[in-house]
């Protein structure tokens, strides 16, 4: 760990959040759980109002979408995952329909404010850079546009390269947490989903190029492709 980094507690870091702020969370396995928990404690204490929370899918719980935080937190999702779907349907969260490739434009164009970016990063290298690991997507643009950037430094975050590498100078507050990253959660497909998977797989010819989405149906289709040949992949994600 870089000895030049000054760490603060999660509770200390989230004090920078003000009522009316727009917050971005890094996504999927990189969701900054320790910061989310600290932010919810501020909500429980009645210290915040009308805070907007934005992110793509996150693994794990999304407590800020709970009905008890009505008027305190409101989640506007770029992707409606299983952990927020019921609360979106109930009206305690909302969905911004947008292509994944366009999410960064929301922040960079100013169409969507970003006051605080809460992210999770790798430990720093000898050059003073950390990696965004499993979550670049809209997170890089959020970091560039935010008033304040809070980073959880976690030794379990993998060091991915390219646009994922950012200098320590882009981060305002550092919080240390070595919790194991949240894995992807997959349920066994239902009989209906299996049937859909079989029907779809029968339409796919050998040599086809695949673009896969996220969820039970794409996984059910993939499970039926074991005997296909020369399949290509051109996709933003691909499940196990």
Identify the role of each PLM range.
Residues 1-240:
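Conserved alpha/beta enzyme-core scaffold
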């Amino acid at each position: 760990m870089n000895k030049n980094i000054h760490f603060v507690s999660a509770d200390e870091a989230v004090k920078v959040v003000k009522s009316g702020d727009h917050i971005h969370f890094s996504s999927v396995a990189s969701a900054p759980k320790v910061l989310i928990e600290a932010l919810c404690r501020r909500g429980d204490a009645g210290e915040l109002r009308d805070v907007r929370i934005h992110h793509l899918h996150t693994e794990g719980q999304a407590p800020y979408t709970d009905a008890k935080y009505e008027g305190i937190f409101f989640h506007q999702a770029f992707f409606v995952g299983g952990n927020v779907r019921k609360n979106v349907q109930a009206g305690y969260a909302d969905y911004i329909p947008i292509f994944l490739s366009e999410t960064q434009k929301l922040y960079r164009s100013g169409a969507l404010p970003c006051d605080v970016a809460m992210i999770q990063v790798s430990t720093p290298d000898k050059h003073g850079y950390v990696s965004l690991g499993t979550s670049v997507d809209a997170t890089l643009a959020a970091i560039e546009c935010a008033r304040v950037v809070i980073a959880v430094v976690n030794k379990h975050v993998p060091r991915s390269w390219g646009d994922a590498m950012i200098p320590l100078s882009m981060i305002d507050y550092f919080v240390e947490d070595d919790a194991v990253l949240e894995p992807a959660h997959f349920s066994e497909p239902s009989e209906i989903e299996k049937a859909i998977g079989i029907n779809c797989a029968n339409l796919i010819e050998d040599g086809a190029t695949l673009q896969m989405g996220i969820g039970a149906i794409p996984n059910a289709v993939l499970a039926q492709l074991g005997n296909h040949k020369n399949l290509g992949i051109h996709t933003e994600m691909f499940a196990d």
